[in-house]
Amino acid sequence: LDLKWFRVPRDVVFGAGTLEYLKQVQGSKAFICMGKNSMRANGVLDKVTGYLKESNIDYTIFDGVEGDPSVETVYRGAEKMKEFAPDLILGLGGCSAIDAAKAMWVFYEYPDKRFEDIKAPFSIPPLRNKARFVAIPSTSGTGTEVTCVAVITEQGGIKHPLASYEITPDIAILDPEICLSMPPNVTADTGVDALSHSLEAYVSTMANDYTDTLALESIKTIFEWLPKAFRDGSDITARTKMHIAQNYAGMSFSNAILGIDHSLSHKISTINTTHGRCNTILMPAVIQYNSKVAGQRYAQIAKYLGLPGSSNEALVSSLVAAIKNLNTSLGIPASLKELGMDENSFLENAETYAKAALEDPCTGTNPRKPSVEDLIQVYKAAYYGYDVVI
């Protein structure tokens, strides 16, 4: 039995002004989980609460979720959920707020569970006994509004991706107007994060016809429209294209899963940068490493983008160059060293990072099976900005 699947939310609502769809969502008590201030500052929170009031839905707000949501924040939010007893959970804002809300949801429905109990992939028990989940993203990056993943940071700064189709939201509301206030650096970092999702999904060992179609279109759209959204954040067409492209990427990787680009990025705990920026700096080295077994797949991506090359090897080189050029156009450094990561700290910890990355859930679907030494070499190539030759 060659069993494959494609699982996404029941409802994906998209287009300018679709935040108003909240008025059609059924419920009596809504728990709104959000970040620190941006949703208040841009007026989105007022719109959300206004629509809930029109529907006679009571609500409470849990705010202050940090950029890399911690286990402690998740536990604190889960306690607030238990006190309020909602039947709707709204993840509002960037991926951190939505990911944190997903994890809180688990502990709200299963108060006796601890983080260690749900770290293994697909170990979360059935949800929706107490509440349904609505995701409203304000950035065009992770696609978490349609994915089975929530990235939570443990002590020591190590990011751990929780993975279960139970935490795939029930409703995703994609309103590009919410993204108009995103500053250029956030637009860039979230956009290249989405690109890393599509690139990894396409070469994953679990890729299929559904995920391939979404990944390719996402990659092409991001290359065309991310620079435009970066240059002019008020361009609603560019914002719409990017919001849909990152959503395609999310649906693709939620079903095909990811690879070592994410495994390596998850484990660098001493670097002060965004997840998306780290992903895209690592990506050229990852592609070069994986191309020894997945060269044809990367070549197909390059052809879809119209890049030059008469052989798989040449097409892979064109793809790597295109990613580097995109990064440069977005003001993203070419290496981890250029990013400012301390060299002594990196060299001291590279083996520790590599060992942790080897055990990351994303490594299991990488097209090339790595060793710890392989991953160290990929880290070093990304740190110094040289080519991978192994």
What do the predicted segments below correspond to?
Residues 10, 16-17, 34-36, 65, ...:
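Fold-independent oxyanion-binding glycine-rich loops
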Residues 72-177:
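Glycine/threonine-rich beta-strand-loop-alpha-helix active-site module
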Residues 149-256:
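Carboxylate- and glycine-rich phosphate/diphosphate-binding segment that chelates Mg2+/Mn2+
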Residues 256-319, 324:
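C-terminal catalytic subdomain
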Residues 302, 308-390:
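C-terminal charged capping/lid subdomain of soluble metabolic enzymes
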